[in-house]
A protein has these predicted regions:
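Short, small/polar-rich motifs associated with maturation and membrane association
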Residues: 1-268, 273-274, 279-286, 349-351
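Hydrophobic residues in alpha-helical membrane-spanning segments
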Residues: 26, 84, 311-314, 357
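Proline-centered flexible-loop/turn and helix-kink motifs
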Residues: 78, 83, 307-311, 362
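A conserved hydrophobic secondary-structure block that centers on an alpha-helix together
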Residues: 261, 270, 347, 356-364
Length: 410
């Protein structure tokens, strides 16, 4: 119970130059630690702790405290909720994050992003796209060295621990969560139209290449992007076991033509008590498939859209299929030509983990944890001859695997 208790013999005094001083009793607000709610238990990584025994800086964001707007990455659910957490999204505004800072810049040569943990599986920012935001039960943020020390140098920039939802006892239930939205450019640069460009050139006596059209290239490359999120979950269980399975889909269309993202996610959690509660077994799987299509040259596309000759047409040559270009300005190209470039990235991610908890004594447990993670990324680019002098094509892929295991007595 919260109580306001006056401190004996304590006065808070205010004295202003040339004015009469004033004093009043000083009050402090206290709370009995033993009266903290039972849900104040934090998952700090390899172990669990409560407000009574955690000495470092730890913050927990539950589902009720998360942001509710359309989000593409789980960390957006806690943006603005955690002091000191800075999130920088990628230029295309899709699911990927460019950087995340929790404890500021801690290294000039190594990475400064915090360590990401999902249900005990260690990873980086790329792992976040495999977790659908509504599948998350809570975030626990570790900032202090006393709590991140358990992860060694990997936790030097802080730790963000994500716990996904689990099944509950009862009949099988189905839950659906969906949302829709649109995105568009808020405003454009105020540039000369084709008619204004001709008029100004005539007044100044300039010699210009006039194709006879009036094209707003900023508007020509834009589109109204549709956004949609869908997630369906099945969960249930009994006294000794429970399960939860969910499937998610996100579709994002950018405000520029040919920009977009499709993301498919899957998550499964199962738990089983064995030998009359002597052993607790937990199994989990989560994974995703993401397809991105982005601009090949973001800076040149937007710069050209603002600076390109507005008297040029907004369609290619009917005979050759090529776009009209300005040959005297190497950094200004027809922005619509860049819409023909195919720049794709496909990423697949899969992770499985298992945890066995042996309840040896009342206050002694042995926990055995293991995880396997696999990811693959494929990049592909194609620049047709109508855009690039001799055309260009590229394809590359990379993959990674990781095994993690630990044994702990607690």
């Amino acid at each position: 119970m919260d109580k306001m208790q006056p401190i004996s013999q304590a006065l808070y005094s205010l004295l202003f130059l040339g004015c009469m001083g004033a004093g009043f009793p000083l009050y402090v607000q206290g709370q009995n630690v033993d009266e903290l709610p039972p849900d104040s238990i934090y998952n700090i990584g390899y172990a669990r702790g409560s407000l009574k025994n955690i000495s470092g800086s730890v913050e927990q964001i539950t589902e009720k405290q998360m942001n509710r707007e359309l989000i593409t990455n789980p960390l957006e659910a806690i943006q603005g909720r955690v002091p000191g957490l800075t999130i920088l999204k990628s230029n295309n505004g899709m699911a990927a994050l460019e950087s995340v800072r929790l404890r500021g810049t801690t290294s000039l040569t190594s990475g400064n992003d915090p360590l990401i943990i999902v249900d005990g599986v260690l990873g980086d920012l790329t792992m976040l796209t495999s977790v659908y935001p509504t599948d998350i039960e809570s975030f626990t943020i570790l900032k202090d060295a006393s709590e991140t020390a358990q992860y060694g140098s990997r936790g030097a920039s802080g730790v963000i621990n994500i716990v996904t939802k689990k099944g509950r006892a009862g009949k099988t239930r189905v839950n659906y969560n969906g949302s829709f939205g649109v995105s568009h450019a808020y405003r454009r640069l105020d540039m000369l139209s084709g008619a204004e460009y001709r008029k100004l050139a005539a007044e100044r006596g300039w010699s210009i290449l006039d194709k006879g059209y009036d094209t707003d290239f900023q508007k020509a490359i834009e589109q109204t992007g549709l956004q949609q999120n869908h997630n369906i979950a099945f969960y249930g269980g009994g006294e000794a076991s429970n399960y939860r399975v969910s499937l998610g889909f996100q579709n994002r269309e950018g405000v520029i033509q040919n920009e977009g993202m499709k993301l498919f996610t899957a998550n499964m959690n199962m738990s089983q008590k064995m030998l009359d509660g002597l052993i607790d077994c937990e199994l989990g799987l989560f994974g995703s498939m993401k397809r991105d299509r982005t601009l090949f040259d973001l800076q040149k596309t937007f710069y050209s859209a603002a600076a390109f000759n507005p008297t040029f047409p907004d369609f290619p040559d009917p005979e050759t299929g090529s776009w009209d270009q300005i040959t005297t300005a190497s950094q200004i190209t027809n922005p619509l030509a860049w819409m023909d470039v195919d720049n794709r990235e496909e990423t697949s991610y899969f992770s499985s983990h298992a945890r066995l908890t042996f309840n040896l004594l009342k206050d002694l447990k042995m926990v055995l944890f293991g995880s396997y993670t696999y990811s693959t990324t494929e990049n592909a680019q194609f620049l047709p001859t109508t855009v690039w002098a001799n055309g260009q094509a590229y394809r590359g892929n990379r993959k990674s695997e990781a095994l993690l295991g630990n044994l702990m007595l607690t």
